[in-house]
């Protein structure tokens, strides 16, 4: 069983991520993880923090000479700003009082759309600092690091590869008639400031981001993650909590600021008649079973069906807005303007990288549940045996 967990605060000493249950023999390096984290910092409209946020990574456990050992893999991502926050975020009690100013000033004006107010109520804080430190999207760096480990496992054991791109940002839609990106388009997507292959839409999106920045506002959008090479039969229909589409939806909704998910054509399917909503089954020129379309997004009955898996997520505009919204100061009970933490005009392109990491982790878990194996070689043999058990025309 594959499990993962993250720990750490936005301005704490480090983020820590751990993944347990990974087979032995997965090739992984510190450089792989550093490169993945660099992709998370890309994207037009990112804030000032991205200019100096450098991710110093250490593989602490579970890897020897570039290969996983089958034991838990732990990763540390150091915070390069830690010296500025040593006292404010100290784990140990201080032997002196800190002035309630500067970085230690109480954050008593919760931001609408953030975890601030409800987190303060839930955990009994009179200051939003403890809430925003953990609820911050900085935590997603941990998940991107774990997602890189999952990427290597999926590719080496199953030949599964993924790619993510932006399909809408700030109300600007990319052209739906363009071919879907493939993993071979990764370099071109990384080169795009808004992670799209649609150059016309790219220019209009950049213009919208510039407008939002001038207006001290923020923008949301829609991302899509595609998974290629996923064999049929991952996930199951027998219990609702083991359905692959349910797990993918949960993984995307667990990313900060995401408010909607669809698999395949998703909500469009609700407006179509049944005769136009499903993917007809045919025998292709090679004598094998095939489909005429992929409206289901590669998942039917909670199981992968062998087609490309398509998952979309809708991200709301970042609620840390320079043009601060109305709130209430919880210390005085009076109306006030919300605190304005350093933020981005949009983080949709970067969020696509996070979403891709979560899809990878979910697919890795469900693929391992299906095929098992204590080593990559054993997992690969199990996959080959499974595929060989099908009649020739069903492969």
Swiss-Prot record:
Cofactor entry: FMNH2
Domain of life: Bacteria
Keyword annotations: Amino-acid biosynthesis, Aromatic amino acid biosynthesis, FAD, Flavoprotein, FMN, Lyase, NADP
Coiled-coil boundaries: none
Residues engaged in binding FMN: 134-136, 256-257, 301, 316-320, 342
PANTHER family: CHORISMATE SYNTHASE
Name of the featured protein: Chorismate synthase
Organism: Bifidobacterium longum (strain NCC 2705)
Gene giving rise to this polypeptide: aroC
